């Protein structure tokens, strides 16, 4: 099958009959130009206000290269006392992330039903609950840790509470969205069979959303392991405290060895959580 080329006259006739198909109207073009100009001016102002310059970037890269050169050779702990301190810090960070995620999930699970429009039919109550989720999420975990450190003192307890409170807002919102996206057909089947509203939630909604809730919780746990490292730097204990101590003392070889251990721990947790998702969700995709 062959097609003949379109002549210039046909193109000109089509342009005359349908001008908007070839070029946007003038108001649209002006609006686009204004948006792109404002966007470019905003970027330029940010770069100027932040002191961006090629010379500064080049000098910073040089200093960064010197810091990275301290990675080799990495430090190897020869005394069990020093290495046990590092392992204890890793264990504290892992415990903070686990307990904080667990406590957050325990409180977020029932609250998510109050925030789901398919379950809570009271708009005023649902609106208040959802805005409460927003208020909790507006506080960064690091800020919560500083507040709890002032209240409960230094140590992992402040980190656990900071992660737990932050997770309530995040997990409750994600749980509520998963519940809202559940299909209503199983619910209608349970109700048609004479089941109550609670039974429809138990036997129709939960089987659909539990795999999603598990996947979200595991992902947040992985993220909280990394957050636990940062919380340790501000005094919440864990491996972050030891890392900040080594960096402050310019013991870069030990600092980089600790960073390597953190990377290995995060990788191991990701692998294990992938196996758990594969076991309960029925797919090995997350474990690849």
Region locations from a protein language model:
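N-terminal, non-cleaved signal-anchor transmembrane helix
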Residues: 1-102, 114, 118, 281-288
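Alpha-helical membrane-interface segments at transmembrane helix boundaries
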Residues: 87-95, 129-136, 222, 244
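Membrane-embedded alpha-helices of multi-pass transport/permease systems
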Residues: 107-111, 158-161, 165-179, 183-187, ...
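Cytoplasmic-entry segments and transmembrane alpha-helices of multi-pass inner-membrane transporters
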Residues: 111-145, 174-177
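Generic hydrophobic transmembrane alpha-helix motif, especially the helices
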Residues: 133-164
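Glycine-rich helix-loop "coupling/hinge" segments at transmembrane-helix boundaries
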Residues: 150, 227-262, 281-288
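Short helix-to-coil transition segments within interhelical loops
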Residues: 182-199, 203-209, 236
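Transmembrane alpha-helices
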Residues: 197-231, 253-262, 269, 273
């Amino acid at each position: 099958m062959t097609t003949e080329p379109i002549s210039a006259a046909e193109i000109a006739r089509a342009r005359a009959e349908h001008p908007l198909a070839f070029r946007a109207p003038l108001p649209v073009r002006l609006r686009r130009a204004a948006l792109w100009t404002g966007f470019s001016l905003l970027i330029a102002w940010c770069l100027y206000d932040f002191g961006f310059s090629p010379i500064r970037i080049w000098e910073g890269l040089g200093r960064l290269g010197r810091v990275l050169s301290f990675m080799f050779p990495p430090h190897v702990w020869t005394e069990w006392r020093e290495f046990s301190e590092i392992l204890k810090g890793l264990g504290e960070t892992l415990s903070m992330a686990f307990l904080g995620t667990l406590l957050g999930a325990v409180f977020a699970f029932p609250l998510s039903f109050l925030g789901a429009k398919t379950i809570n039919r009271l708009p005023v109550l649902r609106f208040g609950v959802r805005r409460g989720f927003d208020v909790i999420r507006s506080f960064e975990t690091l800020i919560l840790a500083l507040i709890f450190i002032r209240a409960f003192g230094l140590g992992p307890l402040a980190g656990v509470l900071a992660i737990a409170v932050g997770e309530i807002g995040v997990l409750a919102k994600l749980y509520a969205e998963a519940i809202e996206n559940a299909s209503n057909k199983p619910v209608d089947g349970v109700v048609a069979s004479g089941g109550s509203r609670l039974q429809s939630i138990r036997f129709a909604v939960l089987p659909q959303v539990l795999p999603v809730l598990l996947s979200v919780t595991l992902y947040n746990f992985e993220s909280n392991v990394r957050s636990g490292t940062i919380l340790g730097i501000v005094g919440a204990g864990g491996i972050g405290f030891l890392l900040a101590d080594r960096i402050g003392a310019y013991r870069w070889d030990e600092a980089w060895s600790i960073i390597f251990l953190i990377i290995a721990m995060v990788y191991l947790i990701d692998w294990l959580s992938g196996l758990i998702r594969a076991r309960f969700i029925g797919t090995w995709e997350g474990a690849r």
